[in-house]
Swiss-Prot record:
Pathway this chain belongs to: Protein modification; protein glycosylation
Record gene name: EXT2
Molecular function as annotated in GO: glucuronosyl-N-acetylglucosaminyl-proteoglycan 4-alpha-N-acetylglucosaminyltransferase activity; glucuronosyltransferase activity; glycosyltransferase activity; heparan sulfate N-acetylglucosaminyltransferase activity; metal ion binding; N-acetylglucosaminyl-proteoglycan 4-beta-glucuronosyltransferase activity; protein heterodimerization activity
Species this protein is from: Homo sapiens (Human)
Protein name, per record: Exostosin-2
Enzyme class: transferase
Result for mutant: Y308A: Increased N-acetylglucosaminyl-proteoglycan 4-beta-glucuronosyltransferase activity. Decreased glucuronosyl-N-acetylglucosaminyl-proteoglycan 4-alpha-N-acetylglucosaminyltransferase activity
Glycosylation positions in this chain: N288, N637
């Protein structure tokens, strides 16, 4: 459209008036600019809050540029760490509130310089490692610069290395934090705890209820389910590039590379070397290196010099012994080399042991069994050793190789505690990428409730019933939780309708044309399926209401490993014929729900297409029947659980469809269905289907209650 323009034929008479208007315009503009400059200047010098975590950024981390806070000698000191703290006793989950993304929010305090009464600095300049840690948090989805939205608080006081700390004064500085509140919901990171002579296994700074992500916990100091055991970061991770080495036997069976070991430990190791010869290599610090050669990058055995950590890749097993501290950076080096760590450190809490299965990547040997370590390792099968080598490297890549990886893994563990229904599964924590099946998740290990925001993908299998197909699409599109609609066009002799003829719906609609007319096409793991939930529905199921479909989806969310559907069927044992029989009559029992209208997890599409036992898939395609029964067998066999029938509806025949249109009306159909059950039971070697005598209905179904107050008023009839 073009805007209409009107011209005034009395233009010359308006010239003096327009000059006056221009003069007023420029005077007004100048006044606004001047007022803006004055307001900006006043704001710069006017006292205002500086409590913004933007103030800890890189440009302001020099101690010379930050506010100075004087700590009087009598400043309050927090209590010692409360060893009885657990998440339900010392952590305030109500600060986290409802979060639709199931993500905690982390606030980083502004950087300040703390000094004592004599002006001596309490805290040193933030270390490079702590700077990287704060940067990792600030760049993550957990970060917030709004202190009022925060669930977790991280101080800008660096306590990674206790050797550099003034214990009392650091604790006093912690108590000055604006939201300290006895350390509730505060997280401290420490990798080198304790100091001479005791070398305690947890940070000695009094911290009251604060959570501690510590790098050297023992079973005596670790508050299980509250603290987080983290690795001691190895600087060599960033300095040395060790290409991944394939699993398998290596030059040395057992290697020790640590320096400064206790004499008794070294004697035991050297005794193993004498007993087992060249298969054991015990290295020590080099004493006669050329000038300029970094001793940290070299290890020696007698007069032979080895590059470190490269030498670790030449060993199958690498010893990780306790030093003055329980946690050792050598563990990270060993994992990077793909060497299986042999941890000999009684009571040591391995990093991220709350979620990582260390039995898959390491061998833990009691200190008293150190002399038997060689025979213990020899008893491990070679195939298991190779799997442990792969797992060791994977742990390093995912959780050890950078400060960022350590920080984010720590926050994820805490996040999983606060939102357990959305927690990362065991497989996601522990399985290397090669083991994971892309975006497919095993329903046996799903969170308690899948995220509702994802909704479901409806897959409609069709051939040429366009009119009823469009009616199904229109009805399904009314379901609030529908995310996408996928039409599987199974007719190779006829083109789908033109784009302009399809119903206009609120969600994406995609048509997939198949190469062959196979019933199994409905269960193919299409890339377009992005949701966990799938609704399989036939093109003649026009009777289901949006309330029925939405209720079915809600039930599936509670039971995501089940087949949740509408048409119920039963299998019976025919004593006269001595075989199984397919039953479609209404009874008190149900053992199958037909996938003409059923919800299931997309994982089962993968299993149906690639892992279906025997020749079942080909048999279904050849007979053009029973793909729904095959899916029932598959799900029941994997889960060991029964189907769930939802809503009372029992009639699903399309009133407009003729006998020619409806496959289920064929006279031989019932006989073939019985044959399918017997065929599948033979292939599976058992009868996995479970019989149940219940169904799921909305709570207020058939109650004398106003319809407008019911969540699902239109459940429909039989």
């Amino acid at each position: 459209m073009c805007a209409s323009v009107k011209y005034n034929i009395r233009g010359p008479a308006l010239i003096p008036r327009m000059k006056t208007k221009h003069r007023i315009y420029y005077i007004t503009l100048f006044s606004i600019v001047l007022l803006g400059l004055i307001a900006t200047g006043m704001f710069q010098f006017w006292p205002h809050s500086i409590e913004s975590s933007n103030d800890w950024n890189v440009e302001k981390r020099s101690i010379r540029d930050v506010p100075v806070v004087r700590l009087p000698a009598d400043s309050p000191i927090p209590e010692r760490g409360d060893l009885s703290c657990r998440m339900h006793t010392c952590f305030d989950v109500y600060r986290c509130g409802f979060n639709p993304k199931n993500k905690i929010k982390v606030y980083i305090y502004a950087l300040k310089k703390y000094v004592d009464d004599f002006g001596v600095s309490v805290s040193n300049t933030i270390s490079r490692e702590y700077n990287e840690l704060l940067m990792a948090i600030s760049d993550s989805d957990y970060y917030t610069d709004d202190i009022n939205r925060a669930c977790l608080f991280v101080p800008s006081i660096d306590v990674l290395n206790q050797n550099t700390l003034r214990i009392k004064e650091t604790a006093q500085a912690m108590a000055q934090l604006s939201r300290w509140d006895r350390g509730t919901n505060h997280l401290l990171f420490n990798m080198l705890p304790g100091g001479p002579p005791d070398y305690n296994t947890a940070l000695d700074v009094p911290r009251d209820r604060a959570l501690l992500a510590g790098g050297g916990f023992s079973t005596w100091t670790y508050r299980q389910g509250y603290d987080v055991s983290i690795p001691v970061y190895s600087p060599l991770s960033a300095e040395v590039d060790l290409p991944e080495k394939g699993p398998g036997p290596r030059q040395y069976f057992l290697l020790s590379s640590q320096v400064g070991l206790h004499p008794e430990y070294r004697e035991d190791l050297e005794a193993l070397q004498v007993k087992h010869g060249e298969s054991v290599l015990v290295l020590d610090k080099c004493t006669n290196l050329s000038e300029g050669v970094l001793s940290v990058r070299k290890r020696c055995h007698k007069h032979q010099v080895f590059d470190y950590p490269q030498v670790l890749q030449e060993a199958t097993f690498c010893v990780v012994l306790r030093g003055a501290r329980l946690g050792q950076a050598v563990l990270s080096d060993v994992l990077q080399a793909g060497c299986v760590p042999v941890v000999i450190a009684d009571s040591y809490i391995l990093p991220f042991s709350e979620v990582l299965d260390w039995k898959r990547a390491s061998v833990v040997v009691p200190e008293e069994k150190m002399s038997d370590v060689y025979s213990i390792l020899q008893s491990i099968p070679q195939r298991q050793i190779e799997e442990m080598q792969r797992q060791a490297r994977w742990f390093w890549e995912a959780y050890f190789q950078s400060i960022k990886a350590i920080a984010l893994a720590t926050l994820q563990i805490i996040n999983d505690r606060i939102y357990p229904y959305a927690a990362i599964s065991y497989e996601e924590w522990n399985d290397p990428p090669a083991v994971k099946w892309g975006s497919v998740s095993n329903p046996l290990f799903l969170p308690l409730i899948p995220p509702q925001s994802q909704g479901f993908t409806a897959i409609v299998l069709t051939y040429d019933r366009v009119e009823s197909l469009f009616r199904v699409i229109t009805e399904v599109s009314k379901v609030p939780s529908l995310s996408k609609l996928l039409v599987v066009w199974n007719n190779q002799n006829k083109n789908p309708p033109e784009d302009s003829l399809w119903p206009k719906i609120r969600v994406p609609l995609k048509v997939v044309r198949t190469a062959e007319n196979k019933l199994s096409n409905r269960f193919f793991p299409y890339d377009e399926i992005e949701t966990e939930a799938v609704l399989a529905i036939d093109d003649d199921i026009i009777m289901l209401t949006s309330d029925e479909l939405q209720f079915g989806y809600e039930v599936w969310r509670e039971f995501p490993d089940r087949l949740v559907g509408y048409p119920g069927r039963l299998h019976l044992w025919d004593h006269e014929m001595n075989k199984w029989k397919y039953e479609s009559e209404w009874t008190n029992e149900v053992s199958m729900v037909l996938t003409g209208a059923a919800f299931y997890h997309k994982y089962f599409n993968y299993l149906y297409t690639y892992k279906m036992p025997g020749d079942i898939k080909n048999w279904v395609d050849a007979h053009m029947n029973c793909e729904d029964i095959a899916m029932n067998f598959l799900v029941a066999n994997v889960t060991g659980k029964a189907v769930i029938k939802v809503t009372p509806r029992k009639k699903f025949k399309c009133p407009e469809c003729t006998a020619i249109d409806g496959l289920s009306l064929d006279q031989t159909h019932m006989v073939e269905r019985s044959e399918c059950i017997n065929k599948f039971a033979s292939v599976f070697g058992t009868m996995p289907l479970k019989v149940v005598e219940h169904r799921a209905d909305p709570v207020l179904y058939k109650d004398d209650f106003p319809e407008k107050l019911k969540s699902f008023p239109n459940i429909g009839s039989l």
